[in-house]
């Protein structure tokens, strides 16, 4: 009778690890990843401290911090190649890798150092792309499809991908293809009432898909159903934690700095994932995103920029608000120095649903506060996508130094996995 071991009891495996990381504001950073096996039960309890680099001036506003944990099956990355790989077993063809640049930090966006061969597993790169495309880009933006990390520009490879500003009137507009009018042809001297109702119904379903259903799962949800994350190869969001990072002002006490003060931000955090059953081989990825609220001393209320106020602008008439089509405005209508060429489409009377922040213009004359010096998009031309994505360069003047970039984090990721795996002793004592 053979004594070859062919199975193992399900035991707990401690995969806890420390992570010392840093990044740029507004860029999506992988802070931890764990490969998992079919049948695993995964638990995560992350604790640590997040710091901003030393601020040049006193602490003015808190920053918004988001942590996300996703599960991505390898099948979503490799497709049929993965299925054949598992069928063939030890005789399977090796899975491909992707090419990185030769610099050690050019795979930082997926939370690893570039190995000596300048290649990393494809599942790390493609899983990050899938997460970004499904959750962190506006649906009307083009997908990121770079085949290799070496195809990324230097900032994206080192500092990760740019994300949108926190939502407000100018950073979350309607899709650019939004229609402002809809026409229906009719026969002379007559109106087809039934055809008119049908046209209304068709317009309604088109608008629903344009504004709220640009992804398959949203369409199915509108029918009262739901889709598995497998339906569109979507990474599964397992847990999301968000909080505001606050701090304190430090007064200078020595002779050279007496009377001066600067801001310090240190925020402890906890991000926990309850026990999650892993249905098939894949990777658990935890990502962080830190952003300041987008505030500009040159922003003003939409009504303040209107030289002639109409009834529709000011009255807030429910009959008009509920029936008028979206309105097209420009950044010039919202910022003193806004570009008139950046057009956005917004719901009618959106200025009665939101209100801009106000900053005294004296702040504009001072450097070092976490405010946008210019209207978004001023330096990038009439490009709406560039305007609503965070530029970390806009916040460079806030920090005394960026030796650890704009934020840094020290954390312990307490990871426990219940897994069918022989003990180390069994692996050493072959047969």
From Swiss-Prot:
Keywords: Capsid protein, T=1 icosahedral capsid protein, Viral genome ejection through host cell envelope, Viral penetration into host cytoplasm, Virion, Virus entry into host cell. It comes from Escherichia phage alpha3 (Bacteriophage alpha-3). It comes from the Viruses. GO terms for cellular component: T=1 icosahedral viral capsid. Its main location: virion. This is Capsid protein F. The keyword Chaperone does not apply. The keyword Transmembrane does not apply. Pentamerizes and interacts with H protein, G and B pentamers to form 12S pre-assembly complex. By binding with protein D, induces joining of twelve 12S complex to form the procapsid. The procapsid has an external scaffold made of 240 copies of protein D, 60 copies of the internally located B protein, and contains 60 copies of each of the viral structural proteins F and G. Upon genome packaging, interacts with protein J. The mature virion is composed of 60 copies each of the F, G, and J proteins, and 12 copies of the H protein. It holds the Pfam family Phage_F. InterPro entries: Capsid/spike_ssDNA_virus, Microviridae_protein_F, Microviridae_protein_F_sf. Belongs to the microviridae F protein family. GO terms for molecular function: structural molecule activity. It is found in: Virion. SUPFAM superfamilies: ssDNA viruses. Assembles to form an icosahedral capsid with a T=1 symmetry, about 30 nm in diameter, and consisting of 60 capsid proteins F. Upon virus binding to host cell, one of the spikes dissociates from the capsid and the virus interacts with LPS through the exposed EF loops on the F proteins. After the genome had been ejected, the channel formed by the F proteins at the unique fivefold axis remains open. One of its GO terms (biological process) is symbiont entry into host cell.
């Amino acid at each position: 009778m053979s004594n070859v071991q062919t199975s193992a009891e399900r035991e707990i495996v401690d995969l806890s690890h420390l992570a010392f990381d840093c990044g740029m504001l507004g860029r999506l950073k992988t802070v931890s990843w764990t490969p998992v096996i079919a049948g695993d039960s995964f638990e995560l309890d992350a604790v640590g401290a997040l710091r901003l680099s030393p601020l040049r001036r006193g602490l003015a506003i808190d920053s918004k911090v988001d942590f996300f944990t996703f599960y991505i099956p390898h099948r979503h990355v490799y497709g049929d190649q993965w299925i054949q790989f598992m069928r063939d077993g030890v005789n399977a063809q090796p899975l491909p890798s992707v090419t990185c640049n030769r610099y050690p930090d050019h795979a930082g966006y997926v939370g690893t150092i570039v190995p000596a061969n300048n290649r990393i597993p494809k599942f790390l790169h493609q899983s990050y792309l899938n997460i970004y495309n499904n959750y962190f880009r506006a649906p009307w933006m083009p997908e990121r499809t770079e085949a290799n990390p070496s195809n990324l520009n230097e900032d994206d490879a080192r500092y990760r991908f740019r994300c949108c500003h926190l939502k407000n009137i100018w950073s979350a507009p309607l899709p650019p293809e939004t229609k402002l009018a809809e026409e229906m042809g009719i026969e002379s001297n007559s109106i087809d009432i039934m055809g008119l109702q049908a046209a209304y119904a068709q317009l309604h379903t088109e608008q629903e898909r344009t504004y709220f259903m640009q992804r398959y799962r949203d369409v199915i949800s509108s029918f009262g159903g739901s889709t598995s994350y497998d339906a569109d190869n979507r990474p599964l969001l397992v847990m999301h934690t968000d909080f505001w990072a606050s701090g304190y002002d430090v007064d200078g006490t020595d002779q050279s700095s007496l009377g001066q003060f600067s801001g310090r931000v240190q925020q402890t955090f906890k991000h926990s994932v309850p026990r999650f059953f892993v249905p098939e081989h894949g990777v658990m990825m935890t990502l962080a995103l830190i952003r300041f609220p987008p505030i500009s001393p040159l922003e003003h209320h939409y009504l303040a920029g209107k030289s002639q106020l109409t009834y529709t602008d000011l009255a807030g008439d429910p009959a008009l608000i509920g029936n008028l089509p979206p309105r097209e405005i420009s950044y010039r209508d919202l910022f003193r120095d806004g570009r008139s060429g950046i057009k956005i489409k917004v719901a009618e009377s959106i200025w009665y649903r939101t209100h801009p922040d106000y900053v005294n213009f004296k702040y504009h004359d001072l450097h070092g506060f976490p405010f946008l010096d210019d209207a978004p998009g001023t330096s990038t031309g009439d490009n709406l996508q560039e305007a609503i994505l965070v530029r970390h360069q806009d916040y460079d003047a806030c920090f005394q130094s960026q030796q650890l970039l704009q934020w840094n984090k020290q954390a312990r990721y307490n990871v426990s996995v219940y897994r069918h795996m022989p003990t180390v002793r069994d692996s050493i004592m072959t047969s």
